[in-house]
Structure formats: C-alpha cells, structure tokens
C-alpha cells in the first residue's frame, strides 16, 4: 500500500465522521461550528509544547495538535483560541465546557480517565524527571535524601514526589505551587533544591529560563514512560474520534515526509 493510499485511509474517515456528526447533531461539533472557533486548553508557557512567541503567536506541539483539529472541523488552522491553564484548572475547564479540547502536556492516567474525560491519541512519550543544579553533585534519585522539590499542585508529579520519597526513604520535602510559572521561578530563585515535571518541559524550562543551562542536570524520577495525550469530554465519542484521527493524520504525514510546502506535490494535486 503506497503512502497516498495509507494517508487517504486515515483522512477519509475523518471526513466521514464530520458528515455523520452533522447529521446526528453532536454537541461539541455543533458548538464549535456555530462559534466558528475551536477553544483549546494550553499551558501557561512551555516552549516546545505551548507558548506564545515574541509576536504573540502560539507555537508548540500541543498548539499544532489543536490547529490540526481546527483545520479538520473549520478549514482554518488559525480558527483557534488558546486558553492558558494551570495544572489545577485544566481538567475542570474541560469538564465544564470552558474548552473543547485539552492537550497541555496531559498525562494519561486511570484516575483521570475515570473522571469525566476521554483520552484520544498520545502525541508525546516521555518520563517524569527532576532538574537540579549541578553544584549539588546529585545525579540520581537515590542521592536526593532530604531535598526540597518545587512541584505544581494538581499534577501527576505531585504523586510522584511522594511515591519516590517513600520507595527510596528519601524524606523529600515538597514545596507546592498553584501554577507552573510560580514553581519554576521559585526553583531558579533557589527556594527548592529540585524541580519536577515532564522531562521535555524541564528541558524547555532549562533552555528558556536558566541564565546558564549547563549549570543544571535533568535525570529520571522513575523508570516509567508517560503518554502525554490530548483529552476531550466523555459522552461525545465521535468528537473524540475526530480529535484522535486528526492526530493520526499528523503522525502519518510526518512519517511520509509530507509538509505544508510539499503536500500538493506529494498527493498529486
């Protein structure tokens, strides 16, 4: 099967879902189409995943996920409004209908899956990590006894700190913050020995906020790999399918080397 056939096998069902949803008056699609905008939950600034550039234009992996859905539903990648949300705010915002889709570096967990949201298709796999100043001489979890850790409340990393501390008998001291920005600023101001979050986000923070990125080390908090996965509300399975297959189309396009510059030539248009 050639790449055109494979890509068509992915994209054509999305078009079919859109037609079926129009006929069945599915709530989320109707709301988005009537509004003419897709409302997407975003981070409060994580370069590489979701952050505005110097001109205020949002960029990043999660941002492009939302734009792909906007193209599928509205035919316009810029018909998206991005709502910055903290770890505590993001899931309630989806549950209450404040947003239509939630990428925002969201880890797929059983507890979340059972609380009114459905996960679609992972768009990034990574581990949870610690970042610490190299000057402390710590390079692995087992050496962190008594360390203070900046952590954002409402995130899976809050649980990881407690689990790691118990498992290795480290007596870690969580310093909890309501939002990502406050946790990061506290870490770089020296209030905590370590900062915990997804490793990709740590690399982004180190590159964008550290005066000298080489002064900091990142290492795994656990041996497990997390699936960061955009989520939608439960009870709207066809909307979930549209989001899922929009992401699949992005993955397929990347594997075939299809870009905005060569898409017409690659598809023979």
Question: Where does each model-flagged region fall?
Answer:
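Acidic, polar ligand-binding/catalytic clefts
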Residues: 67, 71, 75, 79-143, ...
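N-terminal signal peptide c-region/cleavage motif recognized by signal peptidases
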Residues: 15, 20-22
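Sec-exported extracytoplasmic/periplasmic mature domains
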Residues: 33-34, 70-78, 95-99, 107, ...
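Extracytoplasmic small-molecule ligand-binding "clamshell" domains
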Residues: 25-103
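Extended ligand-binding regions for polar small-molecule ligands
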Residues: 64-67, 71-73, 135-137, 142, ...
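Short helix-initiation/N-cap motifs at beta->coil->alpha
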Residues: 80-92, 174-189
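Bilobed "Venus flytrap"/periplasmic-binding protein-like clamshell domains
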Residues: 39-48, 58-73, 107-108, 126-182
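Bacterial N-terminal signal peptides that target proteins for export
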Residues: 1-14
